[in-house]
């Protein structure tokens, strides 16, 4: 497997599968990443994204599109902006990259009853629209679930089988009957959600309500709720709690501050309520988390 791109927040690994087809593994724990180093060279490239964990934002032809766990997004690579964002700062997924000009006309000619033609798949999904999103589908989910843990001893052969299986399902997938979900937002709505998220970060140690934030931005509560849910995939209050607990976890790992002090810095004047909130997000108490993860200071 070839490492395509790596930095502290983002890693992409590419595995050649067939001529013109590669399987790219993505892992991210940051806000955004630029895919220029992993960008396809051909103008006629189809990219099939699958999200396993987290959430990804893509700008496709000027529209902001979002994929969540189980979603499948198909688009022509030339329409996708090089920078992708991860609203939850956490993402794991795959891209099947298909260079239509370099792939054989028929990938499965050795199998008489299997007719897989990448050119026809590209036409099926991206001839009328810039992209196509399939919500969590059991058939596709089964195929991708096995792609994430391929044993090294059979990696090359197994990847070929799974990609061929994916292409076969895409070849017969009924795009007319399937519910087509754009999952796209206008830039103004995306900007509002991200501005509110930045406001939350600047006021980490304060307690505030949705109504107060709505007044601060001069919009309705409903507008913020809808924008926030669309961009981040969670509610306004769930995002606040999750982000506070992530920052609290970082402080538990990298500082020797008492738990009660960390709780206060994140808007909790009651350490028991803080511990309960922390456990609901991280699965363990703050004290246990520190014992298991502390890096710079003795327990």
Regions found by a protein language model. Give the residues of each.
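Key DNA-contact positions within bacterial/archaeal DNA-binding proteins
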Residues: 222, 272, 287
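Terminal helix-turn-helix DNA-binding modules in bacterial transcription factors
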Residues: 194-202, 207-212, 230-272, 291-299
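Core residues of bacterial helix-turn-helix
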Residues: 216-217, 266-267, 278
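Short, Lys/Arg-enriched, Trp-marked, Pro/Gly-tolerant hinge/linker segments that flank
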Residues: 119-135, 152-158, 167-198, 202, ...
């Amino acid at each position: 497997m070839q490492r395509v791109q790596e930095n502290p927040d983002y890693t992409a690994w590419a595995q050649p599968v067939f001529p013109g087809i590669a399987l790219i593994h993505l892992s991210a724990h940051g806000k955004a990443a630029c895919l220029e180093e992993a960008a396809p060279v051909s103008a006629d490239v189809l990219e099939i994204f699958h999200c396993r964990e987290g959430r990804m934002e893509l700008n496709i032809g000027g529209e902001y599109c979002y994929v969540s766990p189980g979603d499948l997004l198909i688009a022509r690579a030339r329409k996708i902006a090089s920078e992708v964002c991860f609203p939850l700062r956490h993402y794991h997924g795959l891209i099947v990259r298909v260079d239509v000009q370099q792939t054989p006309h028929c990938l499965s000619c050795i199998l008489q009853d299997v007719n897989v033609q990448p050119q026809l798949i590209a036409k099926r999904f991206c001839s009328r629209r810039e992209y196509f999103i399939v919500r969590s589908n059991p058939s596709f989910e089964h195929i991708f679930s096995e792609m994430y843990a391929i044993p090294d001893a059979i990696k090359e052969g197994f990847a070929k089988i799974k990609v061929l299986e994916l292409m076969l399902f895409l070849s017969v997938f009924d795009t007319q009957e399937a519910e087509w979900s754009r999952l796209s937002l206008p830039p103004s709505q995306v900007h509002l959600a991200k501005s509110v998220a930045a406001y939350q970060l600047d006021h980490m140690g304060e307690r505030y309500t949705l109504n107060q934030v709505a007044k601060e931005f001069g919009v309705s509560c409903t507008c913020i709720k809808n924008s926030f849910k669309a961009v981040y995939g969670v509610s306004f209050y769930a995002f606040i709690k999750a982000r506070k607990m992530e920052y609290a976890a970082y402080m538990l790992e990298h500082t020797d501050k008492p738990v009660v002090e960390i709780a206060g810095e994140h808007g909790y004047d009651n350490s028991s309520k803080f511990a309960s909130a922390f456990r609901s997000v991280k699965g363990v108490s703050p004290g246990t988390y520190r014992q298991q993860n502390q890096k710079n200071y003795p327990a």
